[in-house]
Amino acid sequence: MDPQTQNTSLQRLQNVENRVVKVLELAGGVMEELASPSGPKKEFVNSHCREFMQSMKDIQVTLREEIKSACEYRPFEKCDYNARIANEICFQKLEYVLTQLEDLKQTADRYPSSD
């Protein structure tokens, strides 16, 4: 991988890291809203959950592209173990987050709308 490509790749991964932080802030905002003494505002929770889900999908796509591009520059043709393992770990983590988010959505849907 030439230095220019590597630098660009690192910048894209830095952007992903920033998006992950934003996603965690969204999740924290939803948790605070759910804990609100006056009850959660359904529209607030729904919009933040939608944004969370879209961001997670975007992050997953970006990470897959980065893993694929890293594999294209690998020195040994069949040496993709690290990339495959990293991809599998990320995939499992995203599945877990999506499951938790679905549970959160179901919980939020049980509360009456306070609009």
Swiss-Prot record:
Matches recorded under Pfam families: Med11
Keyword Signal: no
Keyword Nucleus attributed: yes
Taxonomic lineage from the root: Eukaryota, Viridiplantae, Streptophyta, Embryophyta, Tracheophyta
Name of the featured protein: Mediator of RNA polymerase II transcription subunit 11
GO molecular function: transcription coregulator activity
Single GO BP term: regulation of transcription by RNA polymerase II
Transmembrane segments: none
Listed InterPro entries: Mediator_Med11
Keywords, in A-Z order: Nucleus, Transcription, Transcription regulation
Subcellular location: Nucleus
Native species: Arabidopsis thaliana
Gene3D superfamilies registered for this protein in UniProt: 1.10.287.3490
GO CC list: mediator complex
Function per UniProt: Component of the Mediator complex, a coactivator involved in the regulated transcription of nearly all RNA polymerase II-dependent genes. Mediator functions as a bridge to convey information from gene-specific regulatory proteins to the basal RNA polymerase II transcription machinery. The Mediator complex, having a compact conformation in its free form, is recruited to promoters by direct interactions with regulatory proteins and serves for the assembly of a functional pre-initiation complex with RNA polymerase II and the general transcription factors.
Gene name, Swiss-Prot/TrEMBL: MED11
Family, as annotated: Belongs to the Mediator complex subunit 11 family.
